[in-house]
Amino acid sequence: MDELGPAELARGRTALKRRQITDAALALFLRNGYDKTSMDQIAADAGVSKQTVYKQFADKETLFEEIARGVTGKSDHILDELTAIAQTPVSTGDDLRKTLQRLARRYLDAVMEQPVLSLRRLIIAEADQFPELASHYYQQGPQRGLDLIESALRRWSEQGLLAAPDLRLAASQFAYLVLGSSQDHALFQSGQTPRPAERTRIAKAAASMFLAAYGR
């Protein structure tokens, strides 16, 4: 294997420092909020000089936006898991009920993850100052989740398993049946989330109520 040259080593060191900065900044933003986090604190926690931080990021706003967009982009694997569940072959009402329960449980688990809750809380708090970032977060997270659910409902409706005249509304209703007060409770009560058994109960109830309204 060829040894790395000076340029490659320099790029590697730069990338490492950049990662140290973004990791430290994310932890501080989530813990203290945007306004109460300073570039001095970020530099100290990252173990670099403030000059190094400013060499990588023009200002705190730029750093915050890059971090938030980067974390939001990591939701792809969750959506892939939800898509795989939603694409499970379904041919009977019982199949549909089981698939809805699995979809509901994974959806609830994803939203109840502490990093997700912390980021959501932070984005909401800074939405007025960063409206485009808040919009990006919504489009990449909640909206994509609803799009996925709507697509699954359309397929099941075409199979004759559901009768929902407004699929987007039905997708929103399913999402709220799943998340409901659990999400609000977790956001406003320091991340307190339902225990596994309660999540299963919520998922089953959501599937049952949804099918009571739209099942054939």
Label the model's feature ranges.
Residues 1-8, 102, 143, 147, ...:
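C-terminal peripheral helix-coil segments that are non-catalytic and often amphipathic
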Residues 1-16, 79-88:
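N-terminal intrinsically disordered/low-complexity leader segments
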Residues 17-25, 42, 67, 71, ...:
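Generic hydrophobic, amphipathic alpha-helix propensity
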Residues 20, 28-67:
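Helix-turn-helix
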Residues 21-29, 107, 210:
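Short hydrophobic clusters on alpha-helical segments that form packing/core surfaces
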Residues 34-35, 133, 162:
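Conserved hydrophobic residue
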Residues 66, 79-113, 167-174:
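Hydrophobic alpha-helical connector segments
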Residues 98, 109-118, 122-124, 131-158, ...:
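Amphipathic alpha-helical packing segments from all-alpha helical-bundle domains
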